[in-house]
Structure formats: C-alpha cells, structure tokens
UniProtKB/Swiss-Prot annotation:
It is a peripheral membrane protein. It is found in: Cell membrane; Cytoplasmic vesicle; Cytoplasm, Cytoskeleton. InterPro entries: AH/BAR_dom_sf (IPR027267), F_BAR (IPR031160), FCH_dom (IPR001060), HR1_rho-bd (IPR011072), HR1_rpt_sf (IPR036274), Nostrin_SH3 (IPR035656), SH3-like_dom_sf (IPR036028), SH3_domain (IPR001452). Residues 101-128, 160-222, 295-332 form a coiled coil. This is Nostrin. Pfam families: FCH, SH3_9.
Length: 505
C-alpha cells in the first residue's frame, strides 16, 4: 500500500532531528557514566588516603618525638588534606554534574515519548483517512456498477413486464439510487476531510520539531555547564595539577556553545526547495471511458458533481477573502488583536487555501473528462502538471500541492547570537543553498502573517526588494524599511526592468 507520508519534507526533517537527538542523548549518557566512574574513583581514593593517614598517625604516636617524626607527621597531615580534596571533588561531581544530568535526561525521555506518541497518533489519522478514501471509493465503484446493471435491467424490461413487476423494479432502482448517493457523499466528505487531517499531522510535526530542538539546546547547555564546573574543581588541586589543568582549561576555553547550536541547526535545516503535500483526487465510475454508461448519463452525472464542487469552491473563495480581510484588520488595528489570534487566522487561511487547491484540482480533472465527452478543447489549470495516476488493482489519481515550509530556520539562531554580542561569521555569498542578489524585486501574490520576529508581513500586491534566496523555500528581503524572511511560494519575481519602473513610481 502506498505510504502518503514518506516523501513529506516535514517528516524527513523531523526524522533527521530525531536521529540527531538520539545520538546526542547517547553521548550525554556516556559522558555522565564516565563522570560517575571518576567520582567513584575520587571517593575510593580519598578513603584509601585517609586510612593510610590514620595508620601513619598511630605509628607516629608510639615513636619518640624528633625532627624525623615531625616531618612524617606533616606527611600524615598532607595525606589527610589530599584525601579531603579528592572526596570533595568526587562529591562535587556527583552533586553538580551527575545529578542534574540524570534529571535532565529523565525529563527529556518523558517529553520525547510524549511528542513521539503525539506524532504517531496524528500520522495514523492521515493513513487511516487515506485508506478510508480508497475503501469508500472501492465500495462506491461496486455500488455504481450494480446500480448501472439495475438501471439497464429496468430500461430493457419496460416492454415485456407487467405494471406490478415494473413498479417493483422501479422501487429497487430508487433504493439503489439513494444508497449510491449516500456512498458518494461519504466518499466525497472523506476526501475533503483529508486537508484538516494532513494539516494537523504537519502542525504536530512542526511543534514537535521545535520542542525537540529546545531539548537539544538544553542538553548542549548542560554539557557546557558540567565542563565549566569540572574545570573549577580541578583548578583547586593546586600547583601539582597545574600542567594537567592547563590542557583541560585550554580545551574548555575553546568551547563555543553558539557554534554547537549553529551546527545543530545546519544539520536539521530543511534541504528541499519546496514542500509538496500529496492528496488523493476523487475518481468516479463515470470517468472510465470503458464503462457501460451512455454519454448523456455520463455527462449529466459529471455535471452534477462539478456543480457540487463549484459551490464548495465559491464558498472556500469567500472564506479566503474573509480571512484575508481579517488579517488586514489585525495588521491595521493591533489594539483589538493578539499574536494568538493572528496565528490562528493565518493557520485557518493556510488550511482553507489548501482545501481550495484540492477542490480546484478535482474540478479541473472532472472538467477535462467532460470536455472530452463533449468534444471540446481541454481546459487549462496550473495544477495540470501536478496530477498523477497509478494502479493498485484500480487506477488512483493524486495531486501534489506546493506549500512553503514554515519551520524555524538557522537565521533565527544567528540573529539571536548577534543580539547577545557574540559575532558569528556570516556565510559566504557563494555558499551552498544561498543566492546573493542585488536589488531584485518580487510582488506578493497572497497576504502572509509573520509568525516569527524575523519574518515580514505581506499584503497582496506589496513590492519586496530581494536580498537573498534560500533553498529551503524562504527568501530574505526588505519592505517599507523593515528586513526579514518571507515564503517564496507567496510571491512572484518581477523582471529586472521592473526595478526601474518601481523606482520611478
């Protein structure tokens, strides 16, 4: 059975981060285990030194007091002091490094299990909806074939049956029509419901991605803190451990926590240029050119389905316009809106836009069949190159809809580090995945509500100056004096001479 989740960009990034996180957890556990062994060695060594110091002290008590005995007494005191020092080091490692590490690892494990269960739950909903659609389609196809056979039986029996038998057949046909209508509606509703199910799964992946990312940052910070504590306690050993400590301190002084976080972000950044979500399209018996239906009945049935789609498309378009107006109102009058309202409205608009694309793809597919039946030219639609067919006992159709990937990017961390006063080298203009531009322009096709501090708010028709194009589907530019990121899928790039026209205007 085809897996609808395998090729999803969100899923790939989430799995890569999970693997990275697991490696980090294993590393942290190994470091903690080694520290525990070191603490045990220090405590056991301290006990041994203290026993020897006590034994030497008792020996000296029975000896005659002289300079030699006094010197050995200092040796005994030195052993006691060294024992205390090693014991304090062992206890400090246990208290300040091992205990916090166990607490963090335990909390992380519980959190990760909860996140993984949430992702698995929503993924199962997507797969269940996918399978339910195929099941409902199979059931609808069988019922349609039976209905057509009954219809032909009624048509062929008009002249040779009595009124009573004819009425009986008509009653059967009526029941069959009602049953067929219910199954058709059930199949259609499952297809439409796939939008919200898919979005819920992708939003869960995005939220879990951010949560695991925060856990990784916390783990990196923990290891850095442990190293600093270790360095402080080793340094009190005195001059005899200076050489060893210098090497450790030199290594610790080279630690750059922001560099580690930057490496983490680079490992987990979205590598695909766009995110494509695949949805099943409705496939009806009437679309099969080899079916037994007459062209008139095929045409009539397809037109009724197109009418239903058109009504839903018009409703979705009105909803989209309403949501756009709402977002514009939020931007213009910030006093009666908050970030959660804006985020919720933007999410609704994203879902509605996706639903509209699916409805239009279904409408285009049926319109193409209708045009072929009526011997008219085939209609044109942007999604025509994104519709695919494959066979698994039956022929299935699906569409891949392009959408921007909204996960947090590496620049967020770079900007945050810069604001803290730490300079992070900027990537070269020829680095992989980045295109440096002069003053290229693009025009906003749809409104976009910023979800992060480093993103731009877009209104339909805005002209944005492009500074950089990133491979993960986000561009960097400026609008009305503000610089930030925006999704490339929401804009169209203008020709180079448009810059002169815009500047003259």
């Amino acid at each position: 059975m085809r897996d609808p989740l395998t090729d999803c960009s969100y899923n790939k990034v989430y799995k890569n981060l999970k693997e990275f996180s697991q490696n980090g957890e294993d590393f942290c556990k190994q470091i903690t285990s080694i520290l525990q062994q070191r603490a045990n060695l220090e405590i056991n060594y301290a006990k041994g030194l203290q026993k020897l110091a006590t034994k030497l002290s008792k020996t000296l008590q029975s000896a005659k007091k002289n300079c030699l005995v006094s010197a050995w007494a200092w040796v005994s005191e030195g052993m006691k002091s060294a024992g205390d020092l090693h014991q304090k080091l062992g206890k400090a490692i246990e208290l300040e490094a091992i205990k916090p590490a166990h607490q963090v690892l335990s909390a992380h494990e519980k959190k990760r299990k909860s996140l993984e269960n949430e992702v698995e739950k929503t993924a199962n909903l997507v797969i269940s909806n996918w399978n339910q659609q195929i099941k409902a389609k199979k059931k609808l196809m069988v019922s349609t074939k039976k209905h057509e056979a009954l219809f032909h039986l009624v048509e062929s029996s008009k002249q040779i049956t009595t009124e009573k038998e004819k009425q009986k057949l008509l009653n059967k046909l009526k029941k069959s029509t009602e049953k067929l209508s219910k199954e058709d509606e059930n199949y259609y509703q499952k297809n439409v419901a796939s939008c919200s199910t898919r979005l819920k799964w992708e939003n869960t992946l995005e939220n879990c991605f951010q949560s695991i990312l925060e856990l990784e940052k916390e783990r990196i910070q923990l290891l850095c803190n442990n190293l600093n504590q270790y360095s402080q306690h080793i340094s009190v050993f005195g001059q005899t451990l200076t050489t060893c400590h210098t090497q450790i301190h030199c290594a610790i002084s080279k630690i750059d926590i922001e560099k580690d976080i930057q490496a983490l972000m680079e490992e987990t950044t979205v590598s695909s240029t766009e995110n494509k979500s695949e949805f099943l399209l409705t496939d009806y018996f009437e679309e099969d050119p080899k079916n037994a239906m007459s062209k008139e009945r095929q045409t009539s049935s397809i037109k009724s389905k197109l009418l239903r789609l058109q009504k839903d498309i018009e409703k979705a378009s009105r909803d989209q316009e309403g949501l756009e107006r709402m977002l514009r109102a939020y931007s213009s009058h910030s006093s009666f809106s908050d970030s959660e309202s804006k985020k919720s409205t933007a999410a609704l608009m994203d879902e509605n836009s996706l639903k509209l694309d699916l409805l239009q793809a279904n409408s285009y597919k049926l319109s193409s069949v209708l045009a072929e039946l009526e011997q008219r030219p085939q209609p044109n639609h942007p999604c025509s190159n994104s519709i695919f067919k494959w066979k698994e006992k039956q022929t299935h159709s699906s569409v891949k809809i392009s959408r921007p990937v909204l996960m947090k990017r590496l620049e967020n961390v770079v900007n945050r580090a810069s604001s803290d006063g730490q300079r992070i080298p900027s990537p070269s203009s020829t680095a992989s995945g980045v295109t440096q531009l002069g003053n290229g322009l693009c025009k906003a096709l749809y409104p976009f509500q910023a979800r992060q501090d480093d993103e731009l708010d877009l209104e339909k028709g805005d002209i944005v100056t492009i500074h950089k194009k990133k491979d993960e589907g986000w561009w960097f530019g400026s609008l009305k004096g503000k610089k930030g990121h925006f999704p490339a899928a929401y804009v169209e790039e203008l020709p180079l001479n448009a810059g002169d026209t815009a500047s003259q205007a």
